[in-house]
Every structure is written in structure tokens, then in C-alpha cells.
């Protein structure tokens, strides 16, 4: 397939990019530049558009045949971008440009049916109208395509994804994921990993919500239920994540007994109906394991309770609550002291709170501390009289000090 002469492609790229955020345009350019091996599309890639001789070699030996099938495509790239950054938009934009320019047959595959439905819906909503096949990763007779887009492309689907590749042999493969696992077999099988923007940057630029961080002493069905029931209005609609289904069941039971409308989302429940009820305000809290950690977008969610976990699950879970919602400009993330990976390592919260002596106490320094320091310097430089001293004390005693138990709404 001839991918030379990028003139028409660049024109189509400019047409698609007028709706994209700046970082999305950069990602789309990098993706096209690498997949088409053409630095004219994205000059900053330079020589990186050449094949990486080490790509895909650090893989699990027990799955070597599957990894080899995955690398059999002509070119493959993995877009690693945070939850809420618009990965579906970037994937659809890339597919639209390639289809308009070269007439490629496009396929979109995912592990979960709701991700396929979401991609099809956004294809229409964004106005891309890509002619594409939605393909289950378990399809035994998939259609032949030139470009295969793999949504949520991480290790859970390694075997199924490799099997799908062996049957389809697409010319180009584009993976989309927010999962930052360094050890992912799938990630290591792609020739190029494309990164551009971090969660911290997305929050700073307003594409993701600011958040306050709360730390429980222990994380259990009881502590989560008691926390939410202590102030339902303040915590708002929430999602609580647990390691085991029995824990999710117990938390939902306690919440229900306390007057909350709660449901457990698992592999056997009517997930689509539960999410619809939640979106329509008929449920207050969804309790789950990792079922809701992918492809669950609900901007109106105000709080997420994240079980103790490593970096990957923590980022997946906490990212669920960061989609902007006008009524809640600041969201809430609740973890515990025992977690292996506090989300505060990823992004800076507005305020940090810890639960001590039956109340939430602030760990955040007075936000006016710099201004207070400047005023102190000015006062020191001036002759101190009883009137000026009392005026300064009264003025600054009104500021919130460290250790306050006042929780911002």
C-alpha cells in the first residue's frame, strides 16, 4: 500500500484538527507520522519514524508466538494518554484522515461491548462518520481491515488480541490506552509508544477537574459506607472500588441500610441498566471491582473511593472522577493510608485531608502563607506600635490555618 505524497493527507489533517485540542493535534500528527513512516507530517519525530530494532523484544517468553503475531503488522503505535484526554476522539480523527486520504478499511476492536458502542456513538457525535467495522476481540471470523484500532489496549486482552491479529493481518495498528503499566505485554508489542500530555497538565489547563484528596485510616466496606453516609449531600454521587465482590456486596448492603441507593456492578449484573440509572440520578453509589475502571464516563460523579492498589489501577480508578462537570468544579478522591500508590503522586490536589479523631483535618498549608509572609516583612520593616500590631493580628487571624477541619464543598 502506497503511503507516499502526504499533501492530501496534511490537508485532511488540518480539516480534522480544527476541532481538536492542541495536544490532541500533536498526538494525531505523531501517530500519522509514525504509522506512515513520514517525518514531513510530524517533523519533531525525526528519525524516530524508523522502526525501533528493540521494539517488542522484551516480552513474556511463554507468549512469544502471540507477540510475534501482534508484530506482524506493517506498522503499529500505541497512544498512551490519560483518562479524559479524548483517546476516542484522537483514534477516530486518525482513522478519518487515513480513510479519506487512502481509502483504508477501518476496524475498531475492544474487550467490552460498551466500548464498541461508545466508539460508534462518538463517531457520529463528532461528525467523523468513519466507515468502520466494530469488532469483538473474541470474533472467530473478523472482517479484513487495513487499519485496526484497539481500544483499551492493555494486558487483559493479550491472548485474544494476538489471535485476532493472526486472522486479520492489518497493515496498520493503533492502540489506545490510559494504563501506565510498564510491564504490559501488549504495550511492549507495539513498535512505538506515543505520549504527549499528563494528568497534571490536563488539570492545570482545565481539561480535567481539580480535586481534593481524602485519606481514611483503613479501607473497608464499613469505612467507605460510614464515610459516605456521614454526609451524603457533600460526597454526592460516588463510585466505590474493591478488590473482591464480597466487599462490594457488603458495602452496598450497608449503604442501602443507611438509606442510600446503591448497586453492585460486576460481570453478571445488568451493567448498562445500572449505569443508565446512575446517570439519571436513580442511584447514589456504584460499588464495583475493576469492571467500572474502563469505559465508564460520568462527569456528574463527584467522589471516587479507590481501594489500596498499585499505580495502574489507582490511575484508572481515580481518573473516573476527573471529567469536568460545571456544578462540581472540584471533585473528591478518597484513598487510605495503606495504599501503595497515593494519587497525589500523579497530580497535586487543591486540598489534602486526613481522618483523625473522628473528623477530617486539613494537611494543606495556608494558601495565603506567602502573602502573610510578605506582610510580616513589611511590618518588621516599620516601627511597631500597639495599633498596627493589633490590626495585623486581627486581619490574619481570619485566614484558614493548618489543621482546620473545615471541608470545602
Region spans (language model):
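Post-DEXD/H (motif II) to motif III coupling segment of the RecA-like Helicase ATP-binding lobe
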Residues: 158-207
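Conserved interdomain linker/interface between the two RecA-like ATPase lobes of SF2 helicase motors
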Residues: 195-246
Amino acid at each position: 500500500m502506497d503511503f507516499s505524497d502526504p499533501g492530501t493527507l496534511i490537508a485532511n489533517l488540518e480539516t480534522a484538527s480544527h476541532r481538536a485540542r492542541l495536544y490532541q493535534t500533536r498526538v494525531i500528527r505523531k501517530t500519522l507520522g509514525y504509522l506512515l513512516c513520514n517525518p514531513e507530517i510530524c517533523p519533531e519525530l525525526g528519525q524516530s519514524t524508523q522502526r525501533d530494532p528493540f521494539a517488542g523484544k522484551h516480552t513474556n517468553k511463554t507468549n512469544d508466538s502471540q507477540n510475534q503475531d501482534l508484530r506482524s503488522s506493517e506498522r503499529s503505535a500505541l497512544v498512551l494518554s490519560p483518562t479524559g484526554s479524548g483517546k476516542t476522539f484522537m483514534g477516530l480523527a486518525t482513522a478519518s484522515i487515513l480513510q479519506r486520504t487512502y481509502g483504508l478499511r477501518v476496524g475498531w476492536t475492544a474487550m467490552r461491548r460498551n466500548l464498541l458502542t461508545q466508539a460508534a456513538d462518538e463517531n457520529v457525535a463528532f461528525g467523523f462518520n468513519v466507515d468502520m467495522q466494530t469488532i469483538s476481540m473474541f470474533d472467530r471470523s473478523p472482517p479484513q481491515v487495513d487499519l485496526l484500532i484497539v481500544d483499551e489496549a492493555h494486558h487483559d486482552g493479550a491472548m485474544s488480541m494476538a489471535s485476532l491479529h493472526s486472522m486479520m493481518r492489518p497493515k496498520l495498528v493503533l492502540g489506545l490506552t490510559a494504563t501506565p503499566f510498564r510491564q504490559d505485554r501488549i504495550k511492549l508489542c507495539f513498535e512505538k509508544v506515543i505520549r504527549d500530555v499528563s494528568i497534571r497538565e490536563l488539570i492545570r489547563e482545565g481539561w480535567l477537574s481539580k480535586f481534593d484528596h481524602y485519606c481514611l485510616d483503613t479501607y473497608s466496606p464499613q469505612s467507605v459506607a460510614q464515610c459516605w453516609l456521614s454526609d451524603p449531600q457533600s460526597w454526592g454521587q460516588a463510585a466505590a472500588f474493591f478488590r473482591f465482590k464480597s466487599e462490594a456486596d457488603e458495602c452496598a448492603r450497608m449503604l442501602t441500610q443507611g438509606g442510600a441507593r446503591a448497586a453492585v456492578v460486576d460481570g453478571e449484573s445488568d451493567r448498562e441498566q445500572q449505569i443508565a440509572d446512575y446517570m439519571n440520578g436513580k442511584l447514589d453509589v456504584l460499588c464495583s471491582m475493576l469492571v467500572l475502571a474502563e469505559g465508564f464516563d460520568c462527569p456528574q460523579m463527584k467522589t471516587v473511593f479507590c481501594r489500596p492498589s498499585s499505580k495502574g489501577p489507582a490511575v484508572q480508578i481515580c481518573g473516573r472522577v476527573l471529567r469536568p462537570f460545571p456544578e462540581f468544579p472540584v471533585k473528591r478522591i478518597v484513598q487510605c493510608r495503606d495504599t501503595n500508590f497515593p494519587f497525589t503522586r500523579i497530580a497535586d490536589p487543591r486540598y489534602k485531608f486526613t481522618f483523625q479523631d473522628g473528623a477530617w483535618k486539613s494537611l494543606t498549608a495556608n494558601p495565603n502563607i506567602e502573602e502573610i509572609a510578605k506582610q510580616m516583612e513589611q511590618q518588621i520593616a516599620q516601627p511597631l506600635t500597639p495599633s498596627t500590631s493589633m490590626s495585623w493580628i486581627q486581619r490574619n487571624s481570619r485566614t484558614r490555618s493548618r489543621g482546620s477541619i473545615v471541608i470545602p464543598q
